[in-house]
């Protein structure tokens, strides 16, 4: 398939250069967006009297026939085409004749590509946003069921204070809600400016109606500077950054799932459908999904770094380096979509094991802070209460006891402020339900968080 750009060249391009230059293997995914942009561009050309009404009708008929063949599976994309834009235009011309040759009037591949990427990423972002909403809903549903399941909360991976399973899951729901907001913000900025009509970099002499094409394509307005319109990929970087942040949260959640389903924790049981076995060890039930999410997170980070490094030294306006944007951003999109598609049903079918959580919470003196708070509320300065409780914990460790196993007389050896009500104060359920500060682990707080988060998804 010949190139559209062979103007002054007197020699055919070396086949090795053609192979090196080709992007059809990864930009073919933009074919629908390319056709969408061409339909609007040609309609505008007709409205402005730049091409005839008959040409517009022929172009639209041809583009719709290509689209129909694409949807039916009858369209064969030529792997030897330089890119998807060349393929569409040359296929169109083969079907409708000279009208197809007029489609590119007033347009450059530079603004065409910048438009197609935006349209493609808009659709991808909207799909991912829907996936994140589904995942948040699953987390909320599991949190609602586990709002009363007491478990250890950790710092430094050491048992720290009692929380609930629902409280822990809602932490991730809030994180993902911010990820959703970041994707929405990035998409809103991407949709603010339409590059179509920027030409190669300096606009065009044709009387284009850029406001019409921007509106028809769902943009707020045309970009205000034609050079900027074709020469930046900050929208790719911003969207990839939002996706990388989301992957980071999925990776942290995955790490917790990996720990929780191990025999050392056994806080949850994953459904067999979302685990794998071993080729040699018949007892194994491996959380491969979550391990792969951890691994794939680095892949998305790498894509973000590719985009940043690619753009850092490019002079205005368009440079061929920018062709590398597509593989990076599309791979980031595909990776996040795949992770979300898999992790959501895995979490929906996950079974909590509250008895094991409670047993773990009963060890490790995670009610020590509540013991210190008890003394503080009785009038002892907090620092003194902290030291007193630390001394008690050290003694209990030596004697193989828990705080709850101390008699009242033993408590009073450390302070006369201790009374019978200390046992209620350091009870694990009381420890959780007593933390009534906003956003805390009480059952009422978790249920409110569930309602608040679901309300933000509506």
Task: Show where each model-derived region lies.
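Glycine-rich cofactor/substrate-binding loops
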Residues: 1-37, 98-99, 281-458
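A helix-coil-helix interface module used to build multimeric assemblies
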Residues: 1-189, 193, 199, 203, ...
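Short runs of predominantly hydrophobic/aromatic residues within well-ordered alpha helices
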Residues: 38, 85, 89, 236-239, ...
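Generic, well-ordered alpha-helical scaffold segments in large soluble proteins
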Residues: 41, 62-69, 91, 95, ...
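Residues in soluble alpha-helical coiled-coils and helical-bundle/repeat scaffolds
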Residues: 47-50, 130, 244, 248, ...
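A generic structural-conservation signal
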Residues: 54-55, 223, 384, 405
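Charged, flexible cofactor/metal-binding loops and thiol motifs
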Residues: 117, 122-124, 129, 144, ...
